From Swiss-Prot:
GO cellular component: plasma membrane
Major localisation: membrane
Protein task: NDH-1 shuttles electrons from NADH, via FMN and iron-sulfur (Fe-S) centers, to quinones in the respiratory chain. The immediate electron acceptor for the enzyme in this species is believed to be a menaquinone. Couples the redox reaction to proton translocation (for every two electrons transferred, four hydrogen ions are translocated across the cytoplasmic membrane), and thus conserves the redox energy in a proton gradient.
Membrane topology annotation: Peripheral membrane protein
UniProt keyword list: Cell inner membrane, Cell membrane, Membrane, NAD, Quinone, Translocase, Transport
Classification via Pfam families: Complex1_49kDa (PF00346)
GO molecular function: NAD binding; NADH:ubiquinone reductase (non-electrogenic) activity; quinone binding
Keyword NAD in record: yes
Catalytic activity: a quinone + NADH + 5 H(+)(in) = a quinol + NAD(+) + 4 H(+)(out)
UniProt protein name: NADH-quinone oxidoreductase subunit D
InterPro entries: NADH_Q_OxRdtase_suD, NADH_UbQ_OxRdtase_49kDa_CS, NDH1_su_D/H, NiFe-Hase_large
Amino acid sequence: MSELLLPPEHRYAKIIKEKLNEDGSELSILNLGPTHPATHGIFQNILLMDGERIVDAEPTIGYIHRAFEKIAENRPFYQITPLTDRMNYCSSPINNMAWWMTLEKLLDIEVPKRAQYLRVIVMELARITDHIICNSILGVDTGAYTGFLYVFQFREKIYEIYEEICGARLTTNMGRIGGFERDWSPKAFQLLNTFLEEFPIAWKEFENLFERNRIFIDRTVNVGAISAEKAMAYGFTGPNLRAAGIDYDVRVAEPYSSYEDFEFIIPVGKSGDTYDRFCVRNAEVWESLSIIRQALAKMPEGNVYHAEVPDYYLPPKEDVYHNMESLIYHFKIVMGEVPVPVAEIYHAVEGGNGELGFYLTTDGSRTPYRLHFRRPCFIYYQAYPEMIKGALLSDAIVILSSLNVIAGELDA
């Protein structure tokens, strides 16, 4: 019998017997993951199946748990940034900027306007990357591989822009307290302008491939739907909440990094199903492109970095090599020898897949007393078992893909 696949103490061993006693149906257990290629990460779901229909599901969280929050309690503030890269690595610059803004809020630091605009551009590029990956992979999971080939090359072009800005591609460790370590080169702006010219053509073709595709529509409409009330109750944010009809966006509700200077629409859906989540992300890509163009048009002159308060701002690298005072400050800041205020703060940004927040408690020492990452993927995965109950096994893969659950962010 299928209950032999589980230890006797597992709740499914009891559920199977109860279900058999209720209606006499033949139930089985299916392990989806943790290494199944369709899950796009180290996920496991123990599914209780009635034929091809999912009766119940139990997710297992923590396969790549790396104890980021505990590690952060033993690291100086500047050394926490690489941890943020490795959560949602599809849009790591957003994680970086969110962490710097949390520290700037703690230290009451005003960032130069030019640096704020450059941050907006970087974060919107990261959002586009995130949505390219999510929606193109959703196409692959429904059997439509062509769209993936149309747009995935542009992720590489965005990585080339990252590489020109900071030297890294995926885990960027970009920026610093107070702005950027250096102004962007002319080549970075050239690469950005080329991207803005070429990418919209490919993205329009991508939309046409899917939004008018009968097979794709049949696989996604009314699949994995969640109501606005349930989405709010679970704590959904980002595209998954907006697809359910709630027009909440952190960039508008609590503007940061001068987002109030830009005009953009918040796309919303109606039914909260897989198709709505796909369409909301498609529309958000167009809004991100608009924001980037506005930022370039309004780009102010000036510094990208506040260097006049050396206690918290890393000095320019060329000064570190030739100036003793700069070397001392560089060492003190990186090693965490600069005191910080005793405080308790929360700062959130609109990440690629929802509200990404840092809840920081300090005691005046060189490391955080406590740091909690608000990870949107962790919240979505709590709702996933309910969303796939009654669905077909093939739909479970599509629903997971549409939620854009990233294993690195889920487990942290």
